[in-house]
From Swiss-Prot:
Annotated organelle transit peptide span: 1-36
Primary gene name: fmp52
Organism: Emericella nidulans (strain FGSC A4 / ATCC 38163 / CBS 112.46 / NRRL 194 / M139) (Aspergillus nidulans)
GO cellular component terms listed in the entry, alphabetical order: cytoplasm; mitochondrial outer membrane
Keywords: Membrane, Mitochondrion, Mitochondrion outer membrane, Transit peptide
Name of the protein described by the UniProt record: Protein fmp52, mitochondrial
Length: 233
């Protein structure tokens, strides 16, 4: 049985992570920390889900540190866009700095398993600022030395976003069209947000139980086909 803390619970993937956690009988308690109340909170059992809502993200780490019982799994689907943040500098503060601050707080509290929703192409040596930032987040988390770290690298995230992203909307349309012809035409480069959410939960629980592939005992990467496999179990 697992106690899980989640940040990024109001985003497209994070919302599906939360609904998967609520539905999973292996999860006994969920704590979310967010700037607004997650939609799923209205129908979730109060005994299972506790929501901490604060627009002051500087207090999030202390909120996490004070959780009892200590979360055995910490999941981050936290992220924003340059447009929403106003600049890449502001995006970096949230996506990179806050993510690592929260990861350190979870590690220091005694959390065993850390699950990160990253991105395909994440690489500290990337010429692109976004994928370089994602790579820096991954490296920062791995350096913290959790008992087990799980990193999901989805491709295009298919699903309905609250905010408008025209270029992504076009790509999601084509992904959906190809998926209707045959799933194999889409699964390698695009994954549905609900599938990613369920994969994050299933992989986190498996990591907690030591059920990870050989060679991935400390850090377990899940790519497109892995996400599909674990998200459809």
């Amino acid at each position: 049985m697992a106690n899980v803390a989640l940040i990024g619970c109001t985003g497209m993937v994070g919302a599906h992570i939360l609904t998967s956690l609520i539905a999973n009988p292996a999860v006994t308690r969920i704590d979310t920390i967010s700037r607004r109340t997650p939609q799923a909170a209205s129908s979730a059992p109060q005994a299972k889900l506790t929501t901490i809502v604060s627009t002051d993200t500087s207090k999030w780490a202390s909120e996490l540190s004070s959780l009892t019982p200590i979360p055995s799994i910490f999941i981050s689907a936290l992220g924003t866009t340059r447009a929403a943040a106003g600049s890449f500098e502001n995006q970096y503060k949230l996506d990179h700095d806050l993510n690592l601050e929260m990861a350190k707080a979870a590690r220091d509290a005694g959390t065993k398993v850390y699950v990160l929703i990253s991105s395909s192409g994440a690489d500290v040596k990337s010429n692109f600022a976004y994928t370089r930032m994602k790579g820096e987040i991954e490296e920062g988390v791995k350096a913290l030395g959790f008992e087990r770290t799980v990193i999901l690298r989805p491709g295009l995230i298919a699903g309905q976003r609250e905010e408008s992203r025209p270029a992504e909307a076009v790509a999601r349309f084509f992904a959906g069209a190809l998926g209707k012809v045959h799933s194999s035409l889409k699964d390698g480069w695009a994954q549905e947000s609900d599938v990613i959410g369920k994969a994050a939960v299933n992989a986190g629980l498996k990591a907690l139980n030591g059920e990870v592939p050989a060679g991935s005992e400390k850090v377990w990467y899940l790519y497109g086909s892995d996400i599909i496999q674990h998200g459809k179990e």
